[in-house]
Swiss-Prot record:
The name this protein goes by in its record: Imidazoleglycerol-phosphate dehydratase
Gene that this polypeptide is encoded by: hisB
GO cellular component: cytoplasm
UniProt entry keywords in alphabetical sequence: Amino-acid biosynthesis, Cytoplasm, Histidine biosynthesis, Lyase
Catalytic activity: D-erythro-1-(imidazol-4-yl)glycerol 3-phosphate = 3-(imidazol-4-yl)-2-oxopropyl phosphate + H2O
E.C. no: 4.2.1.19
EC class: lyase
Amino acid sequence: MRTATIKRKTKETDIEVTVDLDGTGVANAATGIGFFDHMLDLLAKHSRIDLTVKAVGDLHVDFHHTTEDVGIALGQAVKQALGNMAGITRYATVLMPMDETLTRVVIDVSGRPFLVFKADFPRDKIGEFDTELVREWFQAFAMNAGVTLHVETLYGENSHHIAESCFKGLARALRAAVAIDPKTAGEVPSTKGQLGG
């Protein structure tokens, strides 16, 4: 089974994340940040990854530490659940519309972490959530999941729609890239015979 649980505790946050890559998209996100929970719910639903996130953070300071640390823990959980990545599809490209917004997400589950993130938010906040934290979350996730990730909003006018298209695009890209490819017969999808090195 491709599952993992990661616990992360610092002076700023106390987080537990569980993933099942072969789930049905069931989400149970409780971070204390309503908009962020909504994004995590979308991520689970559209990736078909079962996801449980329990986070207690220093929200009296701001949402930064909780958002970033959930990205770290979720990335680590996905990486651990993938194991040696044998048999996965590895690559995926998604164009994700959300009303007037269109975002392109391209992923390589390579073991080599990298992020390109290009999205301009017309507002500084979505409710009480700082829009700059969207990039912070993607950075933390990509670096800890060990994926090369390109996220680019091609156009959009509504900050909520832009954020949602980024998370949904990642979800659909993850869904395709971590899927088992029956044609590879359990081989690691690399001419080197391994990923991440």
